[in-house]
Amino acid sequence: MTYRLTRDDFERVVDREFAFLRDAGFGGAAVERRDDGFLAGFDRADLGVRVHCDLDCEDMMTVVARPLLGRELLLETIHALNVGDSRYPSGGGGSWRSLAAFEERLALEATLLRENLTAAAGNDALYEEASGRA
């Protein structure tokens, strides 16, 4: 028996767990329905930073990307879903063992993302200092 995640579920949990992005000036979070799941995005054009919450039946990941010399530098990709994990069965469009399992997973994603953004900001400061731009 699996729980079929709805768009309302996805929006509600993304809004709750990723509110810290809005507090940091990120806009967006418009949820887009795709054949294989849902996609939500946050961005800060002034920093060139985009965060994607991408959910499909096989994989869920959060990606932080920013432009660097005309290319996108992938700062971090977090694979938050093991296909072999029995709590998260494949089955199309976000089938989960329960809504609680999805909420737990996204809460972990948000925590990891906060940590990675903090680390990335620290790395930027070190880069600026090392390059004499500080």
Whereabouts are the PLM-identified features?
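Intrinsically disordered, low-complexity regulatory regions enriched in serine/threonine/proline
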Residues: 1-17, 28-134
